[in-house]
Amino acid sequence: MFLEIRGIKKSFGSGDSKVDVLRGLDLDIAKGEFCVLLGPSGSGKSTLLNIIGGIESADDGSISIEGERLADMKEKKLSQYRRKHLGYIFQMYNLIPNLTVRENIEVGAYLSDRPLDVDELLHTLGLFEHQRKLPNQLSGGQQQRTAIGRAIVKNPDILLCDEPTGALDYNTSKEILKLIETVNQKYGNTVVMVTHNDAIKDMADRVVKLRDGMIRKNYQNEHKIPASDLEW
């Protein structure tokens, strides 16, 4: 199995204020799979995503990628792995304001020894004609496309998406979801997406529903639908 999550536990605080955010999660995600993590606020989905990405550490349990445990990696190797093999897309775009679209994407390319072709990616993103613009000259959707480009140009094994459409309107959200779908299908990256939008589950290969720090449902979609057909 490509991504193996075993017995992951995480809590915050101590004593009477201690909150168990993750309560012993087990999950397998296949290479190239599009997995959606669903759940209400406080269910632990973003914390799980951060642990997969090495941003936070678990209190107990293990995460292995292609058989290698993240906990066994020394800090330098873990940092290199995050830079080279993980791509992050957040609700906030976090673009470098004084760099153009192209330059923002090239920042990601510099971190990889196997980057995608920037020109080809700009065409895929629908940004080729906007590549010389600065972030403040872009719409919200264009800024998020640029952020996706910066994440995917590294050709990461895993693309981690935390509410990537949370700050966007309906039409722009669908465009971004179609783009992430295209990236997953074209480049074969494993996608793990956190969302509170229940409709997005219908485009996923795997759906994992969390509540109170536990997995309540975990199933594969037999008849997933394209992002363009989603409605909410």
Task: Identify the residue ranges that each predicted region occupies.
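ABC family nucleotide-binding domain
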Residues: F2-A204, K209
